[in-house]
């Protein structure tokens, strides 16, 4: 009897201990869950600093400086504007202004006057740029029209919300009171609460969950079934390309003292762009026209042949213009004057674009030439015009090659034209090819890999000429003559053997001329076909041809 009672007591104690252990386990789980929930739940109060939401992304952590709010105006630092909107934003010391460009707009805003100039037109502002603690701040609301953005500041959440007006935006209506979660997990932070009937921005909607942005700028997830009436409130806006196929451009050069060529009866099958040498910079930095009645007839001929017209704007390309070009590039005022002149002639003659052909520049002016292109590009885009820029091969002398920042030019301009000729040119003391295949391909690879230029923006410029080199018995170059492709057969004696060079992908000839030796690396249809193959192989934007 006693043993039975003890056994019953022992069993009862075991059950109690088990119940106690179970209660302890449940309590521990409950504490852990509550702790997790408490940790995962965000109190919907004010933030200590202002958040920045751009196109439905919270980029606050990427801010270089805190957002500044003074007297009701919101300022972003120059560094942050550069990070989020205009990587080429620029402080001009000469005029004491901030210069910023974006798409079709270029704007100037100073540090004293409440004025902003956009594409040459002034308008009043509520404030101006400021310099505080060695940081330049610019009022973001004054740049709405420049960056094409919508700005909303929600004081209750300290969220600065910026939307690009050229990007798609979808909206929906909340169908039931809901909590917005930080993730799609069952237990997740609550970032906001929304009521039935509230309008939200739909960022994505898939697999039963919608990522949304609330009216006060909070971003999170809600079950898809809790939103209705999803509509596209704004479509993506993309600028149409003037030429959708490959560019086939022909430079049509004539000197400053000559008249435009008469092309009345000229057939140009396959060519879709012509670039006559209509414009030059004089020694004072002014844009000079060389069009006249012959040029007007040329324009009419080009249009009748369905050709776009991108005339050259040249700085003459000789060393005498180096100082003038440098003075223009080193002054924002002079750059702006030249840009206005270019825009005016584009409007006057109803041009489709221009081709910048600046050569023989100082290496130290490289960045300023890029600035000129950065500042010109939005004015061209405003009118729907194409900006193409000629550059030489990546390796070479300071004034011939190293004066170009090909990466920036390729990024900003519609097209960058690689003048893949004069490998051995007028200044060469050694005989050689005008445009060897291996040299051209090496240059292209540098454009694509080192300079990181989009292949579709690169136009390959090829020569329709070569040179006849004359050497003495010691190999010294005595003279060199430019020979047009159409005159090559009449220049080389008929009994001279043409040898194919598979590295250069062209024929080579060498023959005696008395005690001297003539050499020529021939440009013909076969050598051109080899180079044209690079356009399709590397998916380039097209072809440009130069004839001397």
What label would you give each PLM region?
Residues 253-269, 332-348, 398-407, 522-536:
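Short, acidic/polar
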Residues 2-206, 228, 233-240:
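Primary recognition of N-terminal secretory signal peptides and signal-anchoring hydrophobic helices
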Residues 231-341:
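Glycan-recognition patch characteristic of GH18 chitinases/ENGases
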Residues 248-252, 271-276, 309-313, 354-356, ...:
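Hydrophobic faces of well-ordered beta-strands that scaffold small-molecule active sites
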Residues 275, 337-368, 415-430, 544:
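Active-site groove signature of glycoside hydrolases
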Residues 464-531:
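Glycan-binding loop/region signatures in secreted carbohydrate-active enzymes
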Residues 283-293, 340, 366-491:
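Substrate-binding surface in catalytic domains of secreted glycosidases
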Residues 197, 209-214, 222:
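SH3/SH3-like beta-barrel fold
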């Amino acid at each position: 009897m006693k043993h039975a009672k003890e056994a019953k007591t022992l069993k009862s104690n075991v059950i109690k201990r088990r119940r106690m252990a179970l209660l302890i386990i449940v309590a521990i789980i409950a504490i852990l869950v509550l702790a997790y929930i408490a940790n995962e739940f965000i109190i919907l109060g004010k933030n200590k600093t202002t958040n920045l939401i751009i196109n439905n992304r919270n980029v606050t952590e990427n801010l270089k400086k805190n957002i500044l709010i003074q007297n009701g105006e919101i300022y972003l630092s120059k560094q942050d504007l550069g990070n989020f909107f205009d990587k080429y934003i620029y402080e001009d010391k000469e005029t004491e202004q901030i210069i910023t460009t974006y798409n079709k707009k270029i704007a100037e805003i100073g540090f004293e006057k409440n004025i902003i100039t956009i594409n040459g037109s002034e308008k009043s502002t509520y404030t101006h740029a400021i310099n505080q603690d060695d940081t330049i701040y610019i009022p973001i609301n004054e740049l709405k029209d420049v960056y094409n953005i919508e700005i909303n500041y929600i004081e209750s959440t300290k969220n600065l919300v910026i939307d690009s007006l050229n990007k798609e935006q979808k909206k929906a209506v909340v169908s039931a009171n809901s909590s917005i979660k930080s993730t799609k997990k069952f237990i997740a932070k609550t970032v906001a609460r929304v009521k039935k009937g509230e309008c939200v921005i739909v960022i994505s909607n898939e697999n039963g969950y919608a990522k949304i942005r609330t009216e006060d700028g909070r971003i999170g997830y809600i079950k898809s079934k809790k939103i209705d009436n999803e509509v596209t409130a704004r479509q993506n806006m993309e600028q149409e390309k003037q030429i959708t196929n490959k560019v086939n451009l022909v430079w049509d050069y004539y000197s400053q003292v000559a008249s435009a060529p008469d092309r009345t009866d000229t057939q140009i099958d396959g060519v879709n762009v012509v670039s006559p040498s209509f414009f030059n910079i004089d020694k004072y930095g002014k844009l000079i026209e060389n069009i006249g009645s012959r040029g007007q007839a040329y324009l009419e001929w080009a249009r009748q042949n369905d050709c776009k017209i991108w005339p050259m704007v040249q700085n003459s390309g000789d060393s005498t213009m180096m100082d003038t070009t440098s003075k223009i590039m080193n002054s924002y005022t002079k750059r702006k004057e030249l840009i206005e002149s270019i825009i005016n002639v584009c409007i006057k003659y109803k041009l489709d674009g221009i081709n910048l052909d600046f050569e023989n520049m100082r290496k130290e002016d490289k960045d300023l030439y890029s600035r000129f292109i950065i500042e010109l590009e939005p004015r061209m885009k405003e009118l729907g015009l194409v900006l193409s820029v000629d550059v030489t091969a990546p390796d070479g002398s300071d004034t011939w090659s190293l004066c170009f920042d090909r990466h920036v030019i390729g990024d900003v301009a519609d097209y960058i034209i690689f003048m893949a000729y004069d490998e051995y040119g007028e200044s060469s003391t050694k005989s050689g090819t005008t445009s060897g295949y291996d040299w051209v391909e090496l240059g292209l690879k540098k454009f694509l890999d080192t300079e990181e230029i989009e292949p579709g923006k690169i136009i390959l410029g090829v020569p329709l000429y070569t040179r006849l080199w004359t050497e003495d018995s010691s190999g010294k170059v005595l003279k060199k003559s430019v020979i047009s492709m159409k005159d090559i057969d009449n220049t080389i004696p008929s009994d001279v053997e043409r040898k194919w060079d598979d590295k250069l992908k062209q024929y080579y000839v060498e023959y005696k001329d008395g005690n001297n030796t003539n050499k020529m690396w021939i440009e013909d249809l076969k050598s051109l076909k080899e180079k044209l193959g690079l356009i399709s192989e590397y998916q380039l934007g097209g072809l440009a041809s130069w004839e001397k």
